[in-house]
Amino acid sequence: MGYLIDGYKPTDDQFKNLSHIGISFLRADNIKGDVVMTDGWDNIDEVVSSAHKNDVKAIISFGGGSYIVTSELMGVKKNRQNLIKNIVRFMAKHNLDGFDCDWEPSWLDDKKEMESVNNAISHHYIKFIKELRIAIDAEFGKGEKSFSAAVMNANNIWYSDQKQISHFPQNGWWHFLDWVALMNYDNDLGAKHSTFESVYGPNGSVKYWNSFGVPLEKIVTGIPFYARAGWGEEWLFYKDIVKMNTNLSFETDFIMYKKNGLNEKEYGFNGKSTIVKKVQENKKLNLPGIMFWQLAGDVEVNSEHSLLRAINKNLN
């Protein structure tokens, strides 16, 4: 599954290498549960129609990393149920094939405030997941629409002073989902960003979430189509790295680069060889699939450097 933002419409060649697209993001516009899309999605129906013409499922993704979900929204039954009603209506209106819950921890400089905001996940996550599953099945028929969620590489905000902020509760919310996608990126910086070991190693994300309770048959791993050197603007699309390095080796997973006058740093990404290795490990573990953020970061799919092409070729 490839995530799309800002109205990005995949090419037909890209669609041929996809099973699902995640249209990002739908958000609550207020604590009453009214919903609105992020900027750029005036063409949502066109993108959904193109996906369906190519036998690709179009899923709506809710939330996102920069979006703050509050207890006033999720902890108040009337507001939560109004949100659920509006999500179901939105799915029906735009002929969507599923819902992806990308309710993430919120990054706030004030750690006490961050802990308070993110307590909404611990206290209300399963209420939202369970009630939305019931509503989706009631409206469209049991199993007619997919329901998934995206979670952190591990169950904490690793770079905060308090490493156990914003737990996803260990109360079985995954039983209501078809799959759980691990956001296996932004876990570290430079050459340590999204390494094979951080996902599949003995202390990696797959092992962590499986031990947490999520069965392997529901775990979808995540791959970045970008490089990360620091927080904020210190990132690069994979396609820009290829453009700047015409002789880029398939084995290369980081480059040294100075962006916008900042200090030269390691920009860590997943090169083609690492992508292939990850896909092969996924198949070895019988995991159901791979997702990536985001499709616009890849080169043209007919390029030998295309990550989408490498994933599809080795997954199928």
Regions found by a protein language model. Give the residues of each.
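Glycan-recognition patch characteristic of GH18 chitinases/ENGases
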Residues: 1-91, 117, 191-201, 217, ...
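Short, acidic/polar
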Residues: 3-17, 75-92, 157-173, 269-283
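Extracytoplasmic/secreted envelope proteins and their assembly/folding machinery
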Residues: 15-18, 44-48, 80-84, 88, ...
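Glycan-binding loop/region signatures in secreted carbohydrate-active enzymes
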Residues: 17-18, 216-283, 301, 306-316
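Short, well-ordered coil/turn segments that N-cap beta-strands
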Residues: 17-19, 54-58, 95-99, 143-145, ...
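Conserved, mostly hydrophobic/aromatic
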Residues: 21, 60, 101, 132, ...
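Substrate-binding surface in catalytic domains of secreted glycosidases
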Residues: 31-42, 85, 105-247
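Aromatic-lined carbohydrate-binding surfaces of glycoside hydrolases
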Residues: 63-71, 103-107, 154
